């Protein structure tokens, strides 16, 4: 777990400096970015979660998913965007300000959200 956390911190550094980090694991795919939007094509059998890595992500808008939100604030002390799924061919996660991580997780056989 120490290396997983180190990878997230390194991804945060990349986002602060204008980049986007991608972390791949066994059944997990994460994107770390700041102050912009990302489009994520539908993945059957996967869930989608959004986390604030900075103290606050403001202006969070999530569309194309079962649970959407518009111009919402996410905080790193409260999990608001966990375990979502696609409702269209593409999910869009927009962050006006702050550093976010979108984590895609492969669902186990028979698992549904």
Q: Residue ranges of each PLM-predicted region?
A:
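Anionic-ligand-binding alpha/beta catalytic cores of soluble enzymes and soluble regulatory domains
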Residues: 1-39
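Long, charged alpha-helical interface segments
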Residues: 26, 33-113
């Amino acid at each position: 777990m120490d290396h997983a956390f180190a990878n997230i911190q390194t991804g945060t550094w990349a986002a602060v400096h204008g980049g986007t980090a991608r972390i791949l694991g066994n059944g997990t795919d994460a994107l770390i970015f700041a102050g912009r939007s990302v489009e994520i094509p539908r993945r059957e059998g996967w869930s989608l979660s959004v986390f604030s890595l900075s103290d606050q992500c403001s202006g969070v808008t999530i569309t194309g998913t079962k649970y959407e939100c518009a111009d919402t604030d996410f905080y790193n002390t409260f999990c608001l965007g966990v375990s979502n799924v696609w409702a269209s061919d593409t999910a869009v996660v927009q962050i006006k300000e702050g550093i976010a991580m979108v984590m895609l997780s492969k669902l186990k056989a028979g698992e549904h959200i």
